[in-house]
């Protein structure tokens, strides 16, 4: 963990807001612009990262230095760890009580050999359950940058994110900012973005709570197709508005470390 420059949790108070999509695409984007990245999936009961990254058939193995991540590329710029890699069948449910989940999360934090990387993005399940307490407590031992909170524009999602803000404050976990996901719909034919839900909810919440608003991510059918098929969206659609949104998020980050990280291609 001490060899990882930036450690970021991705949280949401509600399921279905696209948190795993944000986590995976943020990791892919950072890798795309030259950083070395790790993506840790701690959603033990509903791991979706392996499918999104096209790694469903892969297995993880242990070395003398710990678990070795599954890499998406030969240059090993993006490594992934998920409970899915440890299950013999992707349809096998994880029926564990809290203590066993907590033990697994501790191993994910302490026993993975990420090597020297620039970013570790940690995708979490929705809510504020045992998993969140465990991963936050373990991560706070290693000076994390903080959490990115994901919401959709609707009031019901924003209400749940307020609880997530209270959770972060109670745990003394810094909040990097809020991302408003599903903010508008990108036409796959003309690329025009149209609001189909209410808008600005995430931005208003950020202003109310004095939290940085990182930006909006629209619904993009092409992104959805790539995630379903495990295809790298950025190589398929290099001029997309989604890529521009992710660049804006990264530009808006306030990193905890005083050392500036420089991407290398």
From Swiss-Prot:
GO terms for cellular component: cytosol. [4Fe-4S] cluster binds at residues 187, 190. It comes from the Eukaryota. Keywords: 4Fe-4S, ATP-binding, Cytoplasm, Iron, Iron-sulfur, Metal-binding, Nucleotide-binding. Its cofactor is [4Fe-4S] cluster. InterPro entries: Mrp-like_CS, Mrp/NBP35_ATP-bd, NUBP2/Cfd1_eukaryotes, P-loop_NTPase, YlxH/NBP35. GO terms for molecular function: 4 iron, 4 sulfur cluster binding; ATP binding; ATP-dependent FeS chaperone activity; iron-sulfur cluster binding; metal ion binding. Signal peptide: none annotated. ATP binds at residues 13-20. The keyword 4Fe-4S applies. GO terms for biological process: iron-sulfur cluster assembly. Heterotetramer of 2 nubp1 and 2 nubp2 chains. Component of the cytosolic iron-sulfur (Fe/S) protein assembly (CIA) machinery. Required for maturation of extramitochondrial Fe-S proteins. The nubp1-nubp2 heterotetramer forms a Fe-S scaffold complex, mediating the de novo assembly of an Fe-S cluster and its transfer to target apoproteins. Belongs to the Mrp/NBP35 ATP-binding proteins family. NUBP2/CFD1 subfamily. This is Cytosolic Fe-S cluster assembly factor NUBP2 homolog. It comes from Dictyostelium discoideum (Social amoeba).
């Amino acid at each position: 963990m001490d060899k990882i420059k930036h450690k970021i949790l991705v949280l949401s108070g509600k399921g279905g807001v696209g948190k795993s999509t944000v986590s995976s695409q943020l990791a892919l984007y950072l890798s795309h612009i030259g950083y070395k990245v790790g993506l840790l999936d701690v959603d033990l009961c509903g791991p979706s990262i392996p499918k999104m990254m096209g790694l469903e058939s892969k297995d993880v193995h242990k070395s003398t230095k710990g678990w070795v991540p599954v890499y998406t590329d030969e240059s090993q710029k993006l490594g992934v760890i998920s409970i899915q890699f440890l299950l013999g069948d992707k349809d096998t449910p994880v029926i564990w009580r809290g203590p066993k989940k907590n033990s697994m999360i501790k191993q994910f934090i302490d026993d993975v050999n990420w090597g020297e990387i620039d970013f570790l993005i940690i995708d979490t399940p929705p809510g504020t359950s045992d998993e969140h307490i465990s991963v936050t407590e373990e991560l706070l031992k290693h000076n994390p940058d903080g959490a990115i909170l994901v919401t959709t524009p609707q009031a019901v999602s924003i209400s749940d994110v307020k609880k997530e803000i209270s959770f972060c404050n109670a745990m003394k976990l810094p909040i990097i900012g809020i991302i408003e996901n599903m903010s508008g719909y990108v036409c796959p034919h003309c690329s025009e973005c149209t609001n189909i839900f209410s808008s600005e909810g995430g931005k208003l919440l950020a202003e109310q709570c004095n939290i940085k608003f990182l930006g909006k991510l629209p619904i993009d059918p092409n992104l959805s197709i790539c995630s379903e098929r495990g295809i790298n969206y950025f190589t398929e659609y290099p001029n997309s508005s989604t890529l521009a949104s992710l660049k804006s998020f990264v530009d808006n980050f306030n990193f905890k470390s005083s050392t500036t990280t420089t991407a290398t291609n």
